[in-house]
Regions:
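C-lobe/activation-segment region of protein kinase-like
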Residues: 147, 159-165, 176-246
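Short, glycine/acidic-enriched loop or turn micro-motifs at the edges of active sites
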Residues: 71, 127, 170, 175, ...
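C-terminal/domain-terminus segments
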Residues: 2-15, 136, 233-246
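Surface-exposed, interaction-prone regions with an acidic/low-complexity signature
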Residues: 13-21, 25-26, 70-73, 139-143, ...
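Short glycine/proline- and charge-enriched loop/turn segments
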Residues: 80-85, 130-140, 189-200
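Conserved ATP-binding subdomain of kinase catalytic cores across diverse folds
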Residues: 22-132, 156, 160
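Conserved kinase catalytic-core helix
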Residues: 87-110, 133-171, 176, 180, ...
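Ferredoxin-like alpha/beta domains used as RNA- or RNAP-binding modules
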Residues: 1-40, 139
Length: 246
């Protein structure tokens, strides 16, 4: 199915015919859907659960992959609870995959994107065959100062690729082969194109970097390290203020 923002028409026919239940699907039903649409040949355990989506460990012809599935009805957003979101969850999966693709093509350290089907998409697995790469929040760093420098460089790398992570925190950075890898770009900001007025897009991106710097600062203080937020903002702004409006 092409990566456009619309669900397959058969989904709507099934809704109208009463063939689709509006209860959140079980793990078995999700696994069946992942296999049937060709995103993986084997579906294992759920690796994690976020505000709107769940992540599953899968295999595709033996190779480890990850599949992210946006929940259709159950989210942590109060306004969304109980609503029917077949269209919007497909749109959100599309948006995140697009941001991941732009970042990856721009050389940022993010999982290699796969493909999307409706509210699900696949991407690169990070870790060993025995264990997934840990979140920074749960990792013990042997060289924290070096890792902090790599993280700052990674944030700049995302900006150079035209993407700013708007939910940057130790929970959205994985430690893989001693380096930071950025995940969960669902609410990221594109800064390499027109659309919104440039000043509005710039301010949104800068506020995102400020929040991320505070979150990372709280984490690295456990190692008696400080995140130089003003310097990070200055360097990121220089990369994303394409129209010199800031």
């Amino acid at each position: 199915m092409p990566n456009n923002g619309y669900l397959d028409k058969s989904v709507h026919w099934k809704v109208r015919a009463g063939q689709i239940s509006f209860a959140e699907p079980t793990h078995g039903e999700i696994a069946d859907a992942i296999r049937e649409c060709g995103l993986a040949t084997e579906v294992g355990q759920r690796l994690g659960s976020g505000k709107e989506a769940d992540v599953y460990l899968c295999r595709s012809d033996g190779a480890l992959r990850v599949v992210k599935v946006y929940r259709q009805y159950r989210t942590s957003h109060r306004a969304d609870r109980g609503s029917i979101k077949l269209e919007s969850m497909g749109q959100r999966a599309l948006r995140e995959l697009d941001l991941l693709t732009y970042a990856w093509q721009g050389g940022a350290r993010v999982p290699e994107p796969g493909r999307r089907v409706e509210n699900m998409f696949s991407m690169q697995y990070l870790g060993t065959p025995q264990e997934i790469a840990p979140m920074l929040q749960h990792a013990e760093l042997a060289r924290p100062a070096e890792f902090l420098a790599l993280t700052i460089a990674g944030i700049e790398g995302l900006a150079e690729a035209g993407v700013v992570h708007s939910d940057l925190s130790p929970f959205n950075i994985l430690v893989h082969r001693g380096e930071p890898w950025f995940i969960d770009l669902a609410e990221g900001v594109r800064v390499d194109r027109l659309g919104y007025p440039p000043w509005i897009r710039l301010q949104e991106a800068i506020h995102s970097v400020e929040r991320g710097a505070r979150a990372l600062g709280r984490y690295f203080r456990r190692y008696d390290l400080e995140v130089d937020a003003p310097d990070l903002l200055r360097r990121v702004r220089a990369k994303i203020d394409l129209f010199r409006v800031g």
